[in-house]
Design a protein with these regions (language model features):
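Pre-Walker A adenine-sensing motif
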Residues: 2-16
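Hydrophobic anchor at the beta1->P-loop junction of P-loop NTPases
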Residues: 23
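Conserved lysine of the Walker
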Residues: 31-32
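Short glycine-rich substrate-engagement loop in P-loop NTPases that contacts/grips substrate
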Residues: 53-85
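Conserved P-loop NTPase "ATPase switch" module shared by AAA+ and STAND
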Residues: 80-98
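Structural recognition of the conserved hydrophobic beta-strand(s) that form the central parallel beta-sheet
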Residues: 88, 112-118, 139
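Short regulatory helix/loop adjacent to the ATP-binding pocket of P-loop NTPases
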Residues: 104, 121-137, 151-153
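Accessory nucleic acid-recognition modules appended to NTPase machines
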Residues: 186-284
Length: 284
């Protein structure tokens, strides 16, 4: 298992600080593994097992804790009086009204809180307002090329670099005996999970906001995703994407395209690279 030293260092730097540590990143980039590694770091630093509460909301064993009141009760019963308790809530966005739990735990003494999520939308709206000035976001990416080589147990070479550029840095890909078919199936699984599950989760969070347009056309979403993937590295705008779709026979507005692109970036399928005016040293 490769040590994600950069992110472990960031968590360690914020240890025992009175801010909530929020780890975000695309599915399968290694967030859960990072939390496990950090918990081991805490144990090696003298933290007792009873001072660590760790819950992964994708684990069926914790299904009853998807109710925020049950979750709050469960954690309260396990807090260590007079000692720091380290709380890890993995994929917290699956819990309805999780903001209430996070806010309640934050105001308690001797609580060091860490949460993860696979959708940036969890940090907008109510949670952002609730936690304003009280959290730090650690944005996690898949493996860097250096980490990829380390995970693969090989020195850098043309073949390894070619694989990295073609398939990306998801940890599983670096460590498995891969064939092109296996990797394609694995990546397709991640993509479909993000498109369907994570964006559906984003929609559920927006249901109470009538001013927000909903992502309802998965075919359109995939079309936009494929187009964006085909023009990576080139200047792109909402208008250029809309023009492409219209020329392909899709009737769609720029507002709709903008909303769908937001959904893709919120789920970390794409990242924006802002354009700079070099002459004026100015962000456009």
């Amino acid at each position: 298992m490769i040590q994600r030293r950069e992110y472990l260092g960031q968590l360690a730097d914020w240890k025992d600080e009175s801010v909530i540590k929020v780890v975000t990143g695309i599915r399968r980039c290694g967030k859960s593994t990072l939390l496990n590694q950090y918990q081991e770091y805490l144990r090696n630093d003298g933290v007792a097992d009873e001072q660590i509460i760790s819950i992964n909301f994708e684990d069926l064993d914790f299904e009853e804790l998807l109710n925020y009141k049950e979750l709050h009760r469960y954690i309260k019963e396990r807090l260590c009086e007079g000692k720091m308790t380290y709380i890890f809530l993995d994929e917290i966005q699956k819990v309805d009204s999780f903001q209430k739990v996070v806010d309640s735990l934050y105001i308690k003494e001797n609580v060091d809180l860490y949460i993860t999520g696979s959708n940036a939308y969890m940090l907008s709206g109510d949670l952002a307002t609730l936690l304003s000035g009280r959290y730090v976001e650690i944005s996690m990416l898949p493996l860097s090329y250096h980490e990829y080589c380390e995970a693969a147990g090989r020195e850098s070479c043309a073949e390894l670099f070619s694989d990295f550029m073609k398939y990306g840095g998801f940890p599983y890909i670096a460590t498995t005996n891969k064939t092109e078919e296996k990797v394609d199936m694995y990546l397709e699984g991640i993509y479909n999970t993000v498109i369907i599950n994570d964006i559906e989760e984003r929609q559920r969070r927006k249901e109470n906001d009538p001013d927000k347009r909903k992502v309802t056309d998965i075919t359109l979403l995939k079309s936009i995703s494929k187009y964006l993937a085909s023009v990576i590295g080139s200047p792109v705008s909402v208008k250029s994407v809309t023009d492409y779709l219209v020329s392909s026979g899709r009737k769609v507005s720029q507002n709709t395209v903008s909303d769908y692109i937001d959904a893709l970036t919120d789920s970390f399928v794409f990242y924006t690279a802002d354009r700079f005016d070099i002459a004026g040293i100015q962000l456009l």
